Amino acid sequence: VGDIVATLAPAGLCFGRIANFINGELWGKASQVSWAVIFSDSGAGVQPRHPSQLYEAGLEGLVVFLYIQHRFWQNRVAQEHPGQLAGEFFIAYSIARIICEQFREPDDVLIAGISKGQFYSLGLVAFGVILIMLARIHTARTSAGKSKD
């Protein structure tokens, strides 16, 4: 089930981040880049800011979606190692999140000098690695059991 959810979750993340952009939520750091935007009525002030929500929609959403779809359809990893694709999703999403957080207005509270999103993403990377390891162990045990028959 986790592998199937992993194939769809990035699309939801993409649309959610686009909604954040439209609503002027979770804005980026102040910036002078030519594509910076000003969010009116958002509490972000009148400074031009990185459209970090769109960066996240692209990286956490579209790029992760394409990667997961490729792994699901071309490599058939979900069929060969059930659970691994979910682990790969957690890792890919977390890496994308850590990168995108560089452009986002930081949280009021930092943990060990990094944003809460980056900190929690480190935990998701560990969780993803554990899922992959468990999927591989399960596949090896299942294969060993079948070869004895």
Task: List the predicted regions and their residue ranges.
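A feature for loop-to-transmembrane-helix boundaries and adjacent hydrophobic helices
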Residues: 1-149
